[in-house]
Structure formats: structure tokens, C-alpha cells
């Protein structure tokens, strides 16, 4: 499933470089690692509690908008339901594509914003602006 999710994001990388941010990276880095190996990708990762120096500290409920300027894609893997509206708001403010992979069988907390459910190979997730 994670390979399919990473491949889908990679398929959206039309620009060289495509600028991507993973929000709320936590300890799971499989998708980040895959994307980081792509020649046409510049990627950063943010989290409120960074695990190491490669993660930029940022609170998505009060984001530093400068971090997200000129991004092409924001994605988040299993963000808590209460953070999902903040991630959506951030993507709208940054005028970027958004991909959210919620927990299995979890409904997305999008408030009044319509996201599209996407099935790609073995992965299911929600998109905005894609």
C-alpha cells in the first residue's frame, strides 16, 4: 500500500523540481524515503515534535506559512482527525495540491471542503486540487 501511495505522489511530479512537504511525519518515513530518491523532487518534512534534525518543527494549527510558500504538493499520513481541517486550510492558503491518507476506514474531517476519495493500486486516500 505505501509503495502505491508513494508512486501516486510521484506521478504528480511534473515540474523539475517538484516541491513537496510531508506534514506530521512522526517516525514513519517509507513514503518520504521513496520520494526523496526521485531526481525531480525537493522534499521537506514537518512535525510539531521532530524526531531528528531533518524534520522542521512546525505546528500545523499555527503554521509558519513561509515554509509552505511555492510548494507543489502537501501530503500527510494518518493525521489525527482534529488536525485534518488545519492541514486542508494550509493547503488552500499555500495554493497547493493536497493528499491525506487517513487511518483505515476513517472518514476525513474536512468541514465544508470537498475532498475526492482516490483509489490507486493498493492505496486509498483523499485529494484536493489534484
Segments the model singles out, each with a brief description of its role:
Residues 45-66:
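Adenosine-cofactor binding site in Rossmann-like domains, unifying the SAM/SAH pocket
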Residues 26, 47-49, 104:
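Residues in the short beta-alpha loop(s) of Rossmann-like NAD(P)-binding domains
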Residues 81-130:
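C-terminal substrate-binding/active-site "lid" region of AdoMet-derived donor-dependent transferases
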Residues 16-27:
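Conserved class I S-adenosyl-L-methionine
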Residues 36-42, 93-95:
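Conserved S-adenosyl-L-methionine
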Residues 27-38:
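Conserved SAM-binding loop of SAM-dependent methyltransferases across substrates and taxa
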Residues 65-73:
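A short acidic, Gly/Pro-enriched loop at the edge of an enzyme's catalytic core
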Residues 1-16:
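S-adenosyl-L-methionine
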Amino acid at each position: 500500500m505505501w509503495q502505491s501511495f508513494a508512486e501516486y505522489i510521484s506521478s504528480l511530479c511534473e515540474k523539475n523540481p517538484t516541491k513537496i512537504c510531508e506534514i506530521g511525519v512522526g517516525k514513519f518515513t517509507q513514503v518520504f524515503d521513496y520520494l526523496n530518491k526521485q531526481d525531480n523532487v525537493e522534499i521537506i518534512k514537518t512535525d510539531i515534535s521532530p524526531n531528528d534534525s531533518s524534520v522542521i518543527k512546525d505546528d500545523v494549527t499555527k503554521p509558519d506559512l513561509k515554509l509552505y510558500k511555492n510548494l507543489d504538493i502537501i501530503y500527510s499520513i494518518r493525521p489525527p482527525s482534529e488536525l485534518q481541517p488545519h492541514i486542508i486550510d494550509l493547503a488552500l492558503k499555500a495554493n497547493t495540491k493536497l493528499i491525506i491518507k487517513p487511518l483505515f476506514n476513517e472518514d476525513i474531517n474536512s468541514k465544508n471542503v470537498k475532498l475526492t476519495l482516490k483509489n490507486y493500486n493498493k492505496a486509498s486516500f483523499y485529494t484536493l486540487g489534484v
